[in-house]
Every structure is written in structure tokens, then in C-alpha cells.
From Swiss-Prot:
InterPro entries: Ribosomal_uL22, Ribosomal_uL22_bac/chlpt-type, Ribosomal_uL22_bac/org-type, Ribosomal_uL22_CS, Ribosomal_uL22_sf. Pfam families: Ribosomal_L22 (PF00237). Part of the 50S ribosomal subunit. This is Large ribosomal subunit protein uL22.
Amino acid sequence: MTTSSTKTTAQAHGRYIRGSASKVRRVLDQIRGRTYRDALIMLEFMPYRSTEPITKVLRSAVANAENNLGLDPSSLMISTATADMGPPMKRYRPRAQGRAFAIKKQTCHISISVSATQSTNSEDSD
């Protein structure tokens, strides 16, 4: 996994993850915009295989925010979460009469950005 960060946003990328991008996107759509703790709880109880690499990338992004930017993990929110297609792994299955059928095993690239939530306490003046 490669990692990078900006001033108020920390990012993490998981590249060449085994699994199709569309199946990873359906999980990322559920956690986008949530807090770090809520996202971890949701990922723990989802019945999808793609939650494991997503959890690893999310924890890496939070570790980047904590170590590189000095942000508190309890105040972090998932600002962006994307899954893009990676190159397929090409495999071949032997078939009848000496033929071979191609099998493409999909890979994807997962990118997650976390940023600090801005808690605004607006007091009404009477």
C-alpha cells in the first residue's frame, strides 16, 4: 500500500487488490461520509469479502492522519472513498480437444481519504 497526505486530509491507497471494483464500490458507498468509528463497526459486520482490504486501507489512512498530521482518530471522517479498476490477471482453463479458455480475474485500486470533522457550536443569541 502506498500512502500520501495533504494539510488537512490524509490518504491511503491499496493497489492491485483482488476483487472487482463494482463489488468494492457497493461497500465504499455505505461508509462514505461516516466517522471512522462508525465505518469500522459497519465494516466488521458486513457479509462481504471486500471489507477486509477496505478495513486495512481505512486504518492506514487514519494512521497517516494520526502520525503525519497529528489529528485525533475520534474526530476523523471519511471524506472520499473510491475504487477504480486495476489490470486483470489472465489465467487459462483447459477445455476439450486441446482448447484453452481465458479467465480474467479482476483487480482494483482502493483510495480512501479522511479529514477532521469540523464541530461547529453555533450559539443562538436571544
